[in-house]
Structure formats: structure tokens, C-alpha cells
Amino acid sequence: MHDSFFKLGFGILAFFIIIALISVFYLPYNPVATTGPLWSPPSLSHPFGTTADGQDLFSQWMYGSQPTLFVAFLSAFISAVFGVAVGISAAYFRRADEPLMRLADVFLILPVLPLLIVIATFVRPTNFSASVIIGLLSWPWMARTVRSSALSVKQSPYIEVAIMSGTPHRSIIKDIFNHTLPLVIANSIFSATGGILFLAYMDYLGVGPITSYAWGTTLFFAQTANALYVGAWWWIVPSGLSIGILATGLSLMGYSLENAYRGISQ
């Protein structure tokens, strides 16, 4: 069952990655140019319809997959780097455990979304800076998970023997990391899911990288044009569904990998 969930999630992710790659080389229309009638519903020439300015929403949807995936993966990578470094250090070095975990606790109680909005209000983020901000605010969950797993590995007999025999710290830490890597990958996928949702929230509220035309930005422009009020559902549904479907696909992959890791570790 978990393997089926993983395959489904991977298929969803692969689909959107393919769309993003295609959009790098080909788009039906310029996503910001007027290329059709205003407020046009879906048709053969415009499969997702057009905006209030006559922009092709299918082209915007394809193009929007790029920044959405970019922020998701980069923020997850940054979160993983900091989370793994803090988690393994806290587990391996006893003196570092208390201060590092208290630092993680401080970040955990921070209201991430309001803080993102406040930061973005003063500094209009780019896709890169948004990824960095999201990643730096998301690492504590990774750190706590990695610490717990690393402590279990450290207490295993062969690691204790390696420590007592004077094996270099670097070699032991590398071995601990290798054992926690599957869990790191699973939690990185969850972090990517969070990155997608945080970016969508920021974009929808108008404080994200507004020129990137990520899916959340499309929803922001639909809101400002009162698309729902005038019945232009086609301006909202594709991007909104894509955010939800991609986040669900990543979550399925993450849960499958996490359950597989816990099954092996037990």
C-alpha cells in the first residue's frame, strides 16, 4: 500500500517536473501578453481560458510550475542542510545538545507565515530569497527528527565500540548521517510541501515574488480582478488544484518513505 502511495506521488511530481521542463523551451503564448479575448472561458485555442487582460492562462500555468518547484526544492534543501547539521551535532556532542535544541525551540514557536509576510513587506522577495527565508524558518522540524534518529544510531553497539576505539569523529558522524539519510530524504519532501504552500500563501496575499507568475500569483491576480465574483472559475481552478495536487503527491511520497524507514529501523 505504501509503495502504491509512493508511486502515485512520484507520478504526480514527475508530471509537474515535465511540465516545468517543457515550459523552459516552449509556451503556447507569451504568458504576460494579450493573446485572446478578455475573460474568455476555456477553448481549443486557450485550454484554461484567458484573464481580464486577455492573457493565456494555460501558458501562465505552465510557466508558473517553474518558480513553484524551484522554491519548493531549494527551500527544502536549505532546511535539510541546517536541520541535519544541527540535529547530528546535538545528538553527537553532548554539550551542544541543550543550546542547539533550545535554539530550535525558539524557531519552532515563531509564527512562520506571519513572519514571512512581515519580512516580505519590507523586502520584496525574489524566488531565491523567498526560498532562503522559507528554508531558514523550516529547519527545526528536520533538526529534531534527525537528532532523535541520530541518538538511536549513536547508542547502537557498533557506534559505541567505534567511539571507544578512537575512531575519528568525522568517520562516525558520516556513518550516523548515512543511517539517517532515508529519514532526511522523507522529511525533505515534507519540507518541499511546506515550501509550496508557504509560497502560495505569500503570493496569494500579494507579498511574494509577484513577477514570477507562480501559481499563487495567478490566484492573487484572479482575486484582485474579482474573478470569482464574475464567474471566471477557470482563472482559479487550474492553479488552485495544481497546488493541492502537487502538495498531496509530495506528502504521499514523504509518508511512504518515512514508514519504510521506520519499518527497517524496527
Question: Which residues make up each language-model segment?
Answer:
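N-terminal signal-anchor/first transmembrane alpha helix
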Residues: 1-31, 103, 245
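Transmembrane-helix boundary motif in ABC transporter permease subunits
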Residues: 23-26, 71-105, 117
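Transmembrane alpha-helices
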Residues: 66-82, 170-201
